[in-house]
A protein has these predicted regions:
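Short beta->alpha connector loops
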Residues: 59-61, 133-138, 158-163
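Short catalytic helix/loop segments, enriched in acidic residues and glycine
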Residues: 28-43
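Extreme N-terminal starter segment of soluble prokaryotic enzymes
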Residues: 9-13
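Conserved N-terminal subdomain of the carbohydrate kinase-like
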Residues: 20-32, 49-130, 144-150
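Conserved phosphate/ATP/ADP-binding segment of small-molecule kinases
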Residues: 147-150, 161-208
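Structural preference for beta-strand elements that scaffold enzyme active sites
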Residues: 128, 152-154, 178
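A short, N-terminal amphipathic alpha-helix
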Residues: 40-52, 201-202
Length: 208
């Protein structure tokens, strides 16, 4: 009963990709499956909160059943844009034995390339903001729309965005509390091999 009450209190705004993935690991391989940062954040967070808000974009090729699954897990999809005649974001990657390092094989931005995120009025009072792995310029646009700063802002990113949109990423990072990246990404972002030195350098970029 106590857990149920706590679960209802926590409001989370989730911004990220709702996408198609093709993933290969040493333990198995998938072709085109439903994936995306926001999809997994939403489903995972549903075990802890009944008050989840989603801001993302998909093409008309994205299965309605997958959207229904999110809604069944108490994810409000009012902020999910569906672009007719366009294709959903697609990412393909190969993970190494340690499951911590990976190679990006293919990235098709598709609808994400011109995505203009709109934070609905009803989403403005969320206590927590989770900026999932997507274009840093989109993450920044969401930050700019927040009238009241959430209690905690978390930003996830990856090497692809560092390679192609580093300036946008550093701008978004100035406004966040927590940055989630792996060892390889921390070294690339900071230019330091030592993870202790990397963390200290990244903290100066914004994350606490």
């Amino acid at each position: 009963y106590t857990i149920y009450l706590q679960k209802n209190k926590m409001s989370i705004l989730i911004v990220g990709t709702v996408a198609f993935d093709a993933i290969e690991t040493p333990f198995g391989k998938t072709d085109k499956i439903v994936g995306g940062a926001a999809t997994y954040i939403g489903l995972s967070a549903s075990f802890f909160s009944n008050n989840l808000k989603l801001v993302s974009v998909v093409g008309d090729d994205f299965p309605k059943e997958a959207i229904k699954t999110l809604e069944q897990h108490n994810v409000d999809t009012k902020g999910l844009q569906i672009k007719e005649g366009e294709k959903t974001f697609f990412w393909s990657g190969k993970y190494h034995n340690d499951m911590n390092t990976r190679d990006t094989i293919e990235t098709q931005l598709n609808v994400l390339e011109k995505f203009n995120p709109i934070v609905p009025k009803e989403y403005q009072n969320c206590e927590f903001l989770m900026l999932g792995n997507l274009m840093p310029s989109v993450q920044k646009k969401v930050l700019d729309q927040m009238r009241i700063r959430p209690k905690l802002i978390v930003l996830d990113t990856m090497n692809f965005w560092m390679d192609h949109f580093l300036q946008d990423l550093t701008e978004a990072m100035k406004e966040v509390d927590v940055l989630t990246i792996n060892d390889e990404e921390a070294r690339q972002l900071s230019g330091e091999y030592s993870l202790v030195k990397a963390a200290k350098k990244i903290q100066k970029m914004g994350p606490k």
